[in-house]
């Protein structure tokens, strides 16, 4: 029995042709032919069982046979906002794993001590799509490009909001304990993760003034991408249906 082939098509229900990159993979790598079955995902929670109707040099046409809406396996919306790492492969690693675990938004912060002040999201988007297909998750996280810390915390966000930091002079609560106390309450969750040098103390205070709760991620001192993944996994575990 052939393994199911999955393709990302944002407007799968209304389109009739795979996007160019997906078509090239379907035709050149998987060598799909007319009447072959494939599965599409729209990034908004649905799979589609489809049949290839035309397999040309650069075009792969299809016909939808069945729409299969999926129920999200976690409550609320989970957003992890982090300062991108100096080496982009570490940020890409986090984006891949967070997508596999299941989050709703990945945002990137330009902070005072950020090691990377510029970042491109085209490659990151491709990594996210690949992780969606690999993990069979039909939800594509919103990818929010690099935003100044001030602008991000100044924007109203619903639900529970946290900022992770390492300052002894600012009291913090444990992220896992706090989220566990709110388990199964269908709360949106936003967690801010700083750069390797941490947020500045003024940034932490600014976030607190905007309603963010200062939190600890445990006793270990974690790298940025590890801290971000820890936050994503913790939010997933306590919000799991």
Predicted regions and their residues:
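N-terminal positively charged helical leader segments and presequences
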Residues: 1-70
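Active-site/ligand-binding-proximal alpha/beta "capping" segment
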Residues: 163-206, 212-217
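Fold-independent oxyanion-binding glycine-rich loops
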Residues: 10-11, 20, 43, 83-84, ...
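RNA substrate-binding interface of SAM-dependent RNA methyltransferases
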Residues: 71-163
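Structured adenosyl-cofactor binding patch, chiefly the S-adenosyl-L-methionine
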Residues: 201-241
């Amino acid at each position: 029995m052939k393994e199911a082939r999955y393709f990302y098509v944002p407007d799968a229900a209304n389109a009739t042709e795979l996007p160019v990159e997906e078509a090239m993979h379907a035709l050149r790598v998987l060598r799909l032919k007319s009447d072959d079955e494939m599965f599409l995902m729209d990034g908004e929670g649905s799979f589609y069982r489809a049949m290839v109707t035309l397999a040309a040099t650069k075009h792969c046409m299809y016909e939808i046979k069945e729409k299969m809406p999926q129920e999200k396996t976690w409550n609320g919306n989970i957003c992890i906002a982090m300062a991108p790492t100096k080496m982009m492969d570490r940020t890409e690693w986090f984006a891949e794993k967070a997508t596999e675990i299941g989050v709703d938004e990945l945002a990137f912060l330009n902070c005072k001590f950020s090691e990377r002040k510029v970042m491109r999201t085209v490659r990151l988007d491709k990594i996210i799509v690949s992780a969606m297909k690999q993990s069979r998750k039909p939800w594509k996280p919103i990818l929010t490009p690099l935003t100044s810390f001030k602008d991000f915390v100044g924007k109203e966000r619903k639900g529970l909001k946290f900022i992770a930091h390492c300052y002894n002079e600012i009291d913090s609560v444990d992220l896992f304990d706090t989220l566990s106390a709110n388990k199964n309450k269908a709360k949106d969750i936003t967690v801010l993760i700083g750069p390797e040098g941490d947020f500045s103390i003024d940034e932490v205070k600014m976030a607190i003034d905007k309603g963010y709760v200062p939190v600890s991620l445990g006793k270990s001192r974690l790298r940025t991408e590890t801290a971000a993944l820890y936050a994503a996994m913790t939010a997933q575990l306590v919000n799991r249906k």
